[in-house]
């Protein structure tokens, strides 16, 4: 009877809801940075090159610190890792708000600090902690809830940001983001790793180094890491540069915000479907289909005439595929190596 339960402990319930809130806030804020470019360009004289470099540095730090926060989460608990990361995230937004934001300071605030914060608050660490609370039969479904409910941040944040930037300016918008991140920091306290009595499967006896050695000797894991490079490239390209791209093609700024919101809205359904299918069929086939369809969506968007209709179709189709890779990918990692070092091993995948 116990094995048929979806939730195996009270901690699992609290952790799932808290992780959803953490991801909603963390990725919701991150999703909107592309909308700030015009304001930063006019007010701070941030060039397209400087902005792009900061986002690139941010992504690099996000990836590099993911395995570190994953190892911290595996050893000391998810809440320790995520709270630590939120401190960096809040600091980055705070210094963007207060300044100075010229030259190297902009790179430190937008790139270094926020990037480190994302390494522990974005999807990989909260999801890996949730995965530790669920058995193989329901793990990908539980993980898909984190992705799907977190997507409300993707959906709501661009709408708020577009309105706030027009009505109140970038300073006020960043101030609100700071408050939201503090709320996320509080929620992070409740993202707890299961105790020994709450574990749904026995931990392996492997050491940290043995787990890493086995992972990189496993062909499937190496291919998974390589494939996720493409996933990260897609997401960063679209989230950062599509807002300016549609404006350059003659569309209005509200269309850019609408694309990001549609991505968030349709990602809810795509993530849930991916999680459900990953529990029923081959995760490899699901991932292959997602990557193929992403390519089709991008080609359609580039080669069709610029219009609101084509932009909305792209937002909806790409949104359906946006983070639908995550439940299948994390499910494969957990299936191959168990959950003891899931934070570390999935963090390495996310690094790519």
Q: Can you name each region flagged by the protein language model?
A:
Residues 263-267, 278-332:
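C-terminal transmembrane helical hairpin of 12-TM major facilitator-type secondary transporters
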Residues 65-77, 271-282:
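Helix-to-loop junctions at the C-terminal end of transmembrane segments
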Residues 33-37, 213-274:
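Extracytoplasmic gate region of multi-pass secondary transporters
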Residues 104-121, 229, 310-324:
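Hydrophobic core of transmembrane alpha-helices in multi-pass small-molecule transporters
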Residues 87-101, 293-306:
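C-terminal ends and interior cores of transmembrane alpha-helices
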Residues 145-196:
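Helix-loop-helix hairpin linking two adjacent transmembrane segments in secondary transporters
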Residues 40, 120-134, 324-337:
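Intracellular juxtamembrane helix-capping segments at the cytosolic ends
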Residues 31, 59-67, 154-155, 264-272:
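Residue-level signature of mid-helix packing/kink "hotspots" within the transmembrane helices
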């Amino acid at each position: 009877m116990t094995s048929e339960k979806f939730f195996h402990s009270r901690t699992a319930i609290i952790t799932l809801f808290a992780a959803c809130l953490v991801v909603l806030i963390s990725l919701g804020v991150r999703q909107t940075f592309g909308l700030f470019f015009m304001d930063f360009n006019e007010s701070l004289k941030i060039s397209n090159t400087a902005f792009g470099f900061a986002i690139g540095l941010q992504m690099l730090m996000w990836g590099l610190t993911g395995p570190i926060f994953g190892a911290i989460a595996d050893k000391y608990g998810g809440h320790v890792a995520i709270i630590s990361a939120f401190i960096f995230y809040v600091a980055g937004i705070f210094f963007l708000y207060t300044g100075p934001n010229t030259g190297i300071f902009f790179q430190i605030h937008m790139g270094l600090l926020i990037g480190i914060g994302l390494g522990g608050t974005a999807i990989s660490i909260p999801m890996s902690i949730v995965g530790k609370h669920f058995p193989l039969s329901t793990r990908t479904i539980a993980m898909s809830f984190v992705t799907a409910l977190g997507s409300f941040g993707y959906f709501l944040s661009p709408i708020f940001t577009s309105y706030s930037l027009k009505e109140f300016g970038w300073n006020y918008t960043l101030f609100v983001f700071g408050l939201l991140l503090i709320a996320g920091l509080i929620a992070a306290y409740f993202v707890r790793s299961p105790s020994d009595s709450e574990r749904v499967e026995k931990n392996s006896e492997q050491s940290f180094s043995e787990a890493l050695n086995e992972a990189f000797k496993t062909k499937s894991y190496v291919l998974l890491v390589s494939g996720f490079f493409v996933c990260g490239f897609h997401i960063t390209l679209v989230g950062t540069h599509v807002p300016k791209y549609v404006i350059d093609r003659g569309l209005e700024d509200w269309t850019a915000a609408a694309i990001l919101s549609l991505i968030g809205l349709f990602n809810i359904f795509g993530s849930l479907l991916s999680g459900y299918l990953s529990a029923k069929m081959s995760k490899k086939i699901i991932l292959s289909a997602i990557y193929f369809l992403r390519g089709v969506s991008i080609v359609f968007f580039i080669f069709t005439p610029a219009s609101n209709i084509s932009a909305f179709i792209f937002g909806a189709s790409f949104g359906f595929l946006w983070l639908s890779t995550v439940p299948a990918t994390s499910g494969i990692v957990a299936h191959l190596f168990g959950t003891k070092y899931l934070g570390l091993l999935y963090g390495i995948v996310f690094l790519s």
